Amino acid sequence: MPFIKRTRRSRVLIAAVTAVAAALAVALTLALTVTTYDHTSPRAARDKAKGGVAGSVDCRKAKCVALSFDGGPSPTTPALLDILKQDGLHATFFVQGRGHIAKYPGILRRIAADGQEIGNHTWTHPRLTDLDEADARRELSRTQEAIERVTGERPVLMRPPEGRTNRKVAKICKELGLAQVLWSVTAKDYETTDSALITKRVLDQTHRDGIILLHDLHKGTVPAVPGIIKALEQRGYTLVTVSQLLAPAKPQPGMVYRP
């Protein structure tokens, strides 16, 4: 009986040690792949920067929020550009390669001609964290090259699909001269065509120094934009690009900016 008890205790002890080791391994993996990259907020970046602000808006003084659109260019983008132009506003467009830049280079050219800010949103919209380093770099570099061919300029901003990033992605972005931009407001406009609901979700979440994420390719989004602009301006917000929100700080390659 004593031998049986000792055996049982040994098994329990081994199981406990194994569980602890597994938990430590998971924690270490998460620490290495998720949290070990540099990140800051737009406000913190501004506070550390010195000098004057280029452009007409100083977000250190104004109540700013950045407006950004993912997933274009698409057939709905020109209508959005018309709205922004009518209101004298600029936004940041994180554009995609396959099915977008490749299919609608003329629309991308207009985005640039209208003075809108252009960022990189990968070629095929994969989770970059799931790819090996070579494939992840290819997703971004191919899109950089395509944007440059059409507009003559390479972006300095990117947005990782689904907001998923890690140390590997940060390393690649630093090498390619790209700062990473996340968001604080999402209307989840990919799951609804209800423009009123999209508007409500944006207004409910918006705060000073936030970054709004919308997708101009979805049916309900562009019709919601005029109401969003009007309501935010009535609340005292100034709508700006991501770079204007950061100014006088300059986007730092590899850095993750999240409000």
Language model feature labels by segment:
Residues P2-A21:
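N-terminal export and membrane-targeting signals
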Residues A16-T33, E117, V181-W183, T206, ...:
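Hydrophobic alpha-helical membrane segments, chiefly transmembrane helices and signal peptide h-regions
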Residues V26-K48:
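C-terminal region of N-terminal signal peptides and the immediate post-cleavage residues
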Residues R43-L131, D135, E139, Q144-A146, ...:
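Active-site beta->alpha N-cap acidic-glycine motif
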Residues G51-C59, D87, H100, G220-P259:
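C-terminal domain-boundary segment and adjacent tail
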Residues V65-S68, A91-V95, E117-N120, V156-R159, ...:
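Structural recognition of the beta-strand scaffold that forms the well-ordered cores
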Residues G71-P75, G97-I101, I118, T124-R127, ...:
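Solvent-exposed loop/turn segments at secondary-structure junctions
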Residues P126-R154, E162-R208, T221-P223:
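Alpha-helical scaffold elements lining the catalytic groove of polysaccharide deacetylases
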